């Protein structure tokens, strides 16, 4: 179990309350697929993701980005039990989808970049970033737990 300070809980909750999952999710997944093109192999069912323009205009990419952020909302709501919250999702990504667990970290970085770009230094302060990065690290660890 992770020990969260009251300040960390408040920072995560406050930041999450400002995030539009319909904006940040698609941006983050788009960024992942463009900046780290080897991740595209996990999204073959999404149709054309072979060019930046195709990725930017792909509705399946946008929808899955929203889905990813919905998953993060579950973690925000279950800060004290993120490991169990993500157990089935971790198992699915490991056993069915065969996603390299390092990609979770890479996507988390893309999410942070998008959040920082959206909110800037007035909202995404160093203290908020510290709590947010800790949160994402716990999520990434939980997603990687079912890997052998």
UniProtKB/Swiss-Prot annotation:
InterPro entries according to UniProt: Globin, Globin-like_sf, Globin/Proto, Hemoglobin_b, Hemoglobin_oxygen_transport
Coiled-coil stretches: none
Binding, heme b: 64, 93
Matching PROSITE patterns: GLOBIN
Biological processes per GO annotation: hydrogen peroxide catabolic process
Gene Ontology terms, MF aspect: haptoglobin binding; heme binding; metal ion binding; organic acid binding; oxygen binding; oxygen carrier activity; peroxidase activity
All copies of domain Globin, residue ranges: 3-148
Tissue specificity: Red blood cells.
Keywords annotated in UniProt: Heme, Iron, Metal-binding, Oxygen transport, Transport
Gene Ontology cellular component annotations, sorted alphabetically: blood microparticle; haptoglobin-hemoglobin complex; hemoglobin complex
Disulphide-bridged cysteine pairs: none
Function: Involved in oxygen transport from gills to the various peripheral tissues.
UniProt similarity note: Belongs to the globin family.
Subunit structure comment from the entry: Heterotetramer of two alpha chains and two beta chains.
Protein name: Hemoglobin subunit beta-A
Protein encoded by which gene: hbb1
């Amino acid at each position: 179990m992770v020990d969260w300070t009251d300040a960390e809980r408040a920072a995560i909750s406050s930041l999450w309350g400002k995030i539009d999952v319909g904006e940040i999710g698609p941006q983050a997944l788009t960024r992942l697929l463009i900046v780290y093109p080897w991740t595209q192999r996990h999204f073959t069912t999404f149709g054309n993701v072979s060019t930046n323009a195709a990725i930017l205009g792909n509705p399946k990419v946008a929808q899955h980005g929203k889905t990813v952020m919905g998953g993060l909302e579950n973690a925000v709501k279950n800060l004290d039990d993120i490991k169990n919250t993500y157990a089935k999702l971790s198992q699915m990504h490991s056993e069915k989808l065969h996603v390299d667990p390092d990609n979770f970290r890479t996507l988390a970085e893309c999410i942070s970049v998008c959040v920082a770009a959206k909110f800037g230094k007035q909202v995404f302060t160093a203290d908020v970033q510290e709590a947010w990065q800790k949160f994402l690290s716990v999520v990434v660890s939980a997603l990687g737990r079912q890997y052998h």
